[in-house]
Every structure is written in structure tokens, then in C-alpha cells.
Swiss-Prot record:
Keywords: GTP-binding, Nucleotide-binding, Nucleus, Ribosome biogenesis
Protein name listed in UniProt: Probable nucleolar GTP-binding protein 1
Keyword Ligase: no
Domain of life (superkingdom): Eukaryota
GO molecular function: GTP binding; GTPase activity; RNA binding
SUPFAM superfamilies cross-referenced by the UniProt entry: P-loop containing nucleoside triphosphate hydrolases (SSF52540)
Gene name as annotated: nog1
Alphabetized Gene3D superfamilies for the sequence: 1.20.120.1190, P-loop containing nucleotide triphosphate hydrolases
């Protein structure tokens, strides 16, 4: 269980932001309008409320900041020393102390100015006292800028610290830089620590978790330690020293016997002896890493004696230390190191709990009661003989049913045929006699019955299923298939020749016209200026060729084109008669015609969008069919347009001062509008 959650500490604002937060809150939460005509008591209350509220806001905000940060005397020594190493305990305490002093000074300031405000005799004097009190409070907070900035940096770093439980089962990895601590941790856990071929890749503590005997174990990877005095060690190394000093865990001291880390075995052994005091009263394992590069038997004799001295109390080592070879590359020995370390720590923790006074207080309450025999007489359970006999008979019946074979009709027939044979009388059952079955084979030659064949199925083998004329049958099938394909080809030729010459020419003309229409459609889609359909002129040549393709006579074609031209002239919408046209060219319209044209002009004014009559080649029979197609097209686009989203071309003028944010009632109830 993790004891501390530093991520809950709220953000510490800068001094300027602090002042803005408090003053804006005071402006929002207190009345803002006062007049000199009001009674002096009301004026004093108005300004005293502002001073009180500002001081209270400062007090609450500072109290929350001071309370969120942990007190070094109240937390676990491991975290207290870690904060001291990372942030300097003196600087940390001074910053919190300055905020506490500022809080007390603000409280005293508010008391002094409230006392003066009680005797204010005018609005101007009360306002100046309020202004002076708030100004002194803000000046006081401006001076706390460096402390607030430092505490915000501490908060950010504390939130990024790993969640280490100092009281749980822990494996602690230590040793020189680049000896394989992070690689070993990645093998044990899923922490995914960064591994690089240079020293001091790990610059802080990393935590992973693994399972052993249905329990969760905490694995801590510490930065590398160098062999020099304590006061010369930097912040990175001091994190490892802090973890070794305060966490009760099983320590795994890793030694690179291949010396590829850049340090000799003698230097690594010297480091062990220099920090030996941190290993006392803790389970200890010395892990000989990188045996894939150099086997333990290849280590020089002098270096091997130095390694063995780590577990020899006579030569300054620690008794009970285990020496285990291991390789992170080949994973040789990793499971053994894990099992040994967890088992040693588990036994040590159990033994420690049994020695505690709490166990002694509780263990006398446990009592194991065992019955004692009153005499030497054997009192076995009494089971009636009938029950025993029935159980035996049931077992025999079950066994006989299990051994009884299931016989088919052919087997029964075989038994009946050989029932009088001597072998059957001797106990040889014919259904299990292979030769008895071979006698029943149906073969052309009886000598073949006892041949050794790979498979027997109801008295037949593979040769019985092979047709001797198989090649001849294959040739017949191929000839039949060729005849079928030839017949299909002839049928296709017959279908193609169903049309006579005139129809074939018409079919070719239709195909050519389709191709021409397709090309014209592609040309229309090209990016060239186009005229609207309502103002486009009539192409008489195209219309004449179209009518000719529909087998119209030349006289009919001329009449149709003239009628269409006259009709299109009469359908020009909204076009006024030009000034140059003489009134004598056309007869004066009658009153009925004038009324009809007036009604038509009104109806045309109402319709904002009109559909032009279908042009030749559009594929519409008449205007009604085109209108119906246009309506279906709009209906199909409606659902797609509903899913439209705002794009770069859309423009929107925002309301920069929305009224619902800049007007409204006040909490005091003095105004209906701001």
C-alpha cells in the first residue's frame, strides 16, 4: 500500500497570479456600488466587508498550500531524506515558513485596518483605508514570489516521483554504473527502464513489480554508485544511498565479472566494502552478471578470491551472502536469482513477525485440541456383510460389462460358421483370427487371399477399386469435353448472327452515338465557361441531326425547329421589350391577354427557382419528369448535407461581449443589473 500521494498537491500560482485570483474573487463576491449619501454605518460596513473578505481569501489559499506539502518530520524517513537530497531540506522549510509568516502578517493587517475603518467618518477616508489595506496585502504577497516559484517546482517534481511503499516486500538493485541493473529489472518486471551502453543512464529511482508465491514484490532500480567519500557524491548517487539506508529490503549487489562496464572486479569489490554498513541486518545477494561474456571459471584466481571474500566474515565480508552467476542476455540464472532473493526475504519477514510482541500476545489464545484414546481396543466401522457382498457383485458386473465386446452381424456369422472347429473349442475366437477373415476375400485368384496388402476394407484392397480401362475412359472424357466446348462456340456464333444487315448497321450506329455522347459529356465537364440553361441558345444543327437519327423527314425537321424557336422566344422570363422595338410591330394586347400576362408575371415573381425545360440529350421526356428527378436529387442530398461540418471557408462573427456574462444580479441583492 502506497502511503503518500504527492499528485494531490494543487498547483502553486505565481505571486502576480495569486494577487489576481484573490482580488478578482473579492470583486466578484462582494458588493461593488456605494454612494456618499448613504449612512456612514452602511459605508463602513461596505469597506470592512471587502477588507475582511480579501484577508480571508489570502488566509485560505495560503493554508491550503502549506497543508498540501508534506511535513518532513511526519513522513517516512525514506521520503524525508529523499526530499532533502532532491530539494534541500533547509530551503524547503524556509519557503513554507515564509508563506506561514505572510499568512500571519495578512491576518494582523486586516485586524489593524478593520479597527481604523470603525472610526472612518466619510466615504473617502473609508475608501482610502480599504485601498491601503489591500495594497499592503498585495505588496506582502509580491515579496513571496521566489518562495512560490520554488514550491511549484518542488510540486511538479514530487508528482513525478515513483510510488514507493517503504513497508512492502522489496528487492533493491545496486552496484556500479552499467553493470546490468536496469536490464535485470526489465527481465523481472514490465517497468521498461531505458538501457544504454554508457554510464548513468538511470538518473533516478525506478519501480517495477513482480509476482512470487502469489504475492506482489516491489523491485527498485537505483542509479549507479561510485567509490568515493559520502560528501563527494552527487544527487544521483545520494538517491541510491537513501534507498539503501531506509528501505528494509533484499539487496542485490551486481558485479560485472566481464569488466565491460569500465570498472575492474577489484574496484567493484572495494565499493561493496565502502557501503557495507548499509547492508547490515538485511538479506544480501551478490549477483555475478554477464557470464555470457566471461564464465566464472574463466575469472583469474586473484579476482575470484576477492569475489569470495564478500561472503567470508573472516576477510571482512558479510556472512550468509549468496553468490549467484547470471546473464541478462541469455537469461541464464535469472529465475534462480529471483527465487533465492524472494525466499530469503520472505523467511526473514516471517521470522521477524514471529519474534514481535504482538505475536506473543496473540499466540496463547490459539489452542489445538486432539482426541486421546481411552484404551487400546480397536473400534473399526461396522458394515453389514450384505452391503459388502452387494458392492462386490456390482463391481464384478461393471467389469464384465466393460470387457464384453460389441459384435457386428459379420462377426456373429463368423462365430456360427466356426462354432464346431477345434480352435474354437480351444478358446481361439475366429473373429480375432486374421486368416479366418482372409478366407472370405472375394478375389479372382484364391492364391491372392493371403498376400500382404497395405489396407483391407471388407475383404477388398486398393487394387479392387482400380478400373483396368482407366486410360481409355479418360480419353473418352476428354473427347466428350472437346465436343461440348465446340458446341458452345457454335451456339455463340449462332447468337451473333441473329441480326440482319440493317439491324446490325443500326446497332453499330447506336453504339457510335453512345460513344459520341460520352465524349460530349466529358467535354462539358471540363473547366470552361458555361452559359446557364435558361439563357443558352438552340443548336439547330445538333437538333436536326438528332431528329434525322429518329427517322424524321426533312420537311418535318424544319417545322419542328421553327416551332421550338418560336416557343423559346415566348418563354423568355422577365425580359422587357427593348426601347428600339416599335409598338406598331405587334398588335396591342387585349384586356384578357393583359390580365393573363399579369397573373403569369406575379406567379413568376413568387417562384425564386425555376427548372429549365429539358434540352435534347438530357434524357427527360418532359418538364414534369425533370422536376421529379430534381426533387429526388435534392432529397438524396439532404441527409448528406446534414453531416456537413464547419470548414475553412466558413465565416462567423463572434460576440466578444456576451450579455449573459456581463450583466446580471449580484449576490448581495442590491441591484437587478450590473
Amino acid at each position: 500500500m502506497v502511503l503518500y500521494n504527492f499528485k494531490k498537491i494543487q498547483v502553486v500560482p505565481t505571486s502576480k497570479d495569486f494577487i489576481d485570483i484573490v482580488l478578482s474573487k473579492t470583486q466578484r463576491k462582494t458588493p461593488t456600488e456605494i454612494h456618499k449619501q448613504y449612512a456612514i454605518g452602511r459605508i463602513r460596513t461596505f469597506y470592512m466587508r471587502k477588507v475582511k473578505y480579501t484577508a480571508q481569501s489570502y488566509h485560505e489559499k495560503l493554508t491550503q498550500i502549506i497543508g498540501d506539502f508534506p511535513l518532513l518530520d511526519d513522513i517516512h524517513p525514506f521520503y524525508a531524506d529523499l526530499i532533502n537530497v532532491l530539494y534541500d531540506k533547509d530551503h524547503y522549510k524556509l519557503a513554507l515558513g515564509q508563506l506561514n509568516t505572510a499568512r500571519n502578517l495578512i491576518d494582523n493587517l486586516s485586524k489593524d485596518y478593520l479597527r481604523l475603518l470603525k472610526y472612518g467618518d466619510s466615504l473617502y477616508r473609508c475608501k482610502q483605508l480599504k485601498r491601503a489595506s489591500l495594497g499592503r496585502m498585495c505588496t506582502l504577497m509580491l515579496k513571496q514570489g521566489p518562495s512560490l516559484q520554488y514550491l511549484e517546482q518542488v510540486r511538479q517534481h514530487l508528482a513525478r516521483l515513483p510510488s514507493i511503499d517503504p513497508n512492502t516486500r522489496t528487492l533493491l538493485l545496486t552496484g556500479y554504473p552499467n553493470v546490468g541493473k536496469s536490464s535485470f529489472m526489465n527481465k523481472l518486471t514490465r517497468a521498461n527502464v531505458d538501457v544504454q551502453p554508457y554510464a548513468f543512464t538511470t538518473k533516478s529511482l525506478f519501480v517495477g513489480h513482480t509476482d512470487f508465491k502469489y504475492n506482489t514484490w516491489q523491485v527498485i532500480d537505483t542509479p549507479g554508485i561510485l567509490d568515493h567519500p559520502l560528501d563527494e557524491r552527487n544527487t544521483i548517487e545520494m538517491q541510491s544511498i537513501t534507498a539503501l539506508a531506509h528501505l528494509h529490503s533484499c539487496v542485490l549487489f551486481l558485479i560485472d565479472i566481464s569488466e565491460r562496464c569500465g570498472y575492474t572486479i577489484k574496484q567493484q569489490v572495494d565499493l561493496f566494502f565502502s557501503i557495507k554498513a548499509l547492508f547490515l541486518n538485511k538479506p544480501l545477494l551478490v549477483v555475478l552478471n554477464k557470464i555470457d561474456a566471461r564464465r566464472p571459471e574463466d575469472v583469474p584466481e586473484d579476482d575470484w578470491k576477492l569475489i569470495q571474500s564478500l561472503a567470508d566474515p573472516a576477510r571482512g565480508g558479510i556472512g550468509g551472502t549468496h553468490l549467484i552467476p547470471m546473464s541478462n542476455l541469455t537469461e541464464e540464472g535469472i529465475a534462480k536469482v529471483k527465487d533465492t532473493a524472494c525466499s530469503i526475504l520472505f523467511e526473514e519477514r516471517v521470522e521477524k513477525k514471529l519474534k514481535s510482541t504482538r505475536i506473543e500476545k496473540e499466540i496463547h489464545r490459539l489452542h489445538l485440541a486432539q482426541p486421546q484414546a481411552r484404551d487400546k481396543k480397536v473400534r473399526a466401522p461396522c458394515i453389514p456383510e450384505s452391503v459388502i457382498a452387494a458392492a462386490r457383485q456390482a463391481d464384478m458386473d461393471e467389469e464384465s460389462d466393460y470387457k464384453k465386446p460389441t459384435l457386428t452381424a459379420a462377426m456373429m456369422e463368423m462365430i456360427e460358421e466356426h462354432e464346431n472347429d477345434e480352435k474354437y473349442a480351444q478358446g481361439i475366437i475366429p473373429i480375432y483370427d486374421v486368416n479366418a477373415w482372409k478366407k472370405k476375400y472375394l478375389l479372382k485368384n484364391d492364391e491372392w487371399k493371403f498376400d500382404i496388402v497395405p489396407e483391407i476394407i471388407n475383404g477388398q484392397n486398393i487394387a479392387d477399386f482400380v478400373d483396368p480401362d482407366i486410360l481409355k475412359r479418360l480419353e473418352e472424357l476428354e473427347m466428350e469435353e472437346e465436343a461440348f466446348l465446340e458446341e458452345l462456340k457454335n451456339a455463340e456464333d449462332d447468337e451473333e448472327s441473329d441480326l440482319d444487315e440493317e439491324n446490325e448497321a443500326l446497332y453499330d450506329e447506336i453504339q457510335e452515338k453512345k460513344h459520341e455522347l460520352r465524349i460530349n459529356h466529358q467535354i462539358k465537364d471540363s473547366s470552361k465557361p458555361q452559359l446557364s440553361k435558361g439563357r443558352r441558345g438552340i443548336d439547330t444543327k445538333e437538333m436536326a441531326s438528332h431528329l434525322k437519327s429518329m427517322h424524321h423527314e426533312d420537311d418535318e425537321i424544319g417545322d419542328i425547329i421553327q416551332s421550338v424557336r418560336d416557343h423559346s422566344k415566348s418563354r423568355i422570363s422577365g425580359k422587357k421589350r427593348s426601347r428600339s422595338a416599335s409598338r406598331s410591330d405587334s398588335q396591342a394586347p387585349t384586356s384578357e391577354e393583359r390580365g393573363l400576362s399579369l397573373n403569369r408575371s406575379k406567379s413568376r415573381q413568387r417562384s425564386t427557382t425555376r427548372i429549365a425545360s429539358p434540352a435534347p440529350g438530357e434524357g427527360f421526356h418532359d418538364l414534369a419528369q425533370k422536376e421529379k428527378a430534381d426533387k429526388l436529387d435534392k432529397r438524396s442530398r439532404k441527409k448528406r448535407n446534414q453531416d456537413g461540418r464547419k470548414g475553412e471557408s466558413d465565416r462567423h462573427v463572434y460576440n466578444l461581449m456576451p450579455k449573459h456574462l456581463f450583466s446580471g444580479k449580484r449576490s448581495g441583492g442590491t441591484n437587478d443589473f450590473r
